From Swiss-Prot:
GO terms for molecular function: metal ion binding; threonine-type endopeptidase activity. Keywords: Allosteric enzyme, Cytoplasm, Hydrolase, Metal-binding, Protease, Sodium, Threonine protease. This is ATP-dependent protease subunit HslV. One of its GO terms (cellular component) is proteasome core complex. The active site is at 2. Allosterically activated by HslU binding.
Amino acid sequence: MTTIVSVRRNNQVVIAGDGQVSLGNTVMKGNAKKVRRLYHNKVLAGFAGSTADAFTLFERFEAKLEMHQGHLMRAAVEMAKDWRSDKVLRKLEALLAVADAESSLIITGNGDVVQPENDLIAIGSGGAFAQSAATALLENTDLSALEIAEKSLTIAGNICVFTNQFKTIEELKY
């Protein structure tokens, strides 16, 4: 699978992801970019799960952002409604982590939209490791959101066999 982590601190939000694509127990690619900018570079998004499914979701989510003039929460809720009602979308196996200057959200394969506590998101196979590391760093250091995301992703990559050390990191300052 993968690991995606999003951290918000001091007028900065970051989404970071590793680059491993696995098929069963085989690493197929080590430098995949699972994090990108959407809607005029104002929204960050990362995915965990099936790569093909995630690209479908990125396209649909970006269309929802355009339709709702970049309003993240509204686009996420509309995307979730579609996900629940569309037979094709319901079969997609992916999670999206999305963030803008105001909100951080998880959009699940069940069509749920979750705004996590402390604006900390960690999804994918290494998500629990990254979340633990990021929580400890948020509570006990003055590191920036970028530094916390990078360090927590490194820790997850050291523990989770489906997460590697190649990182794609996107940041918004506001």
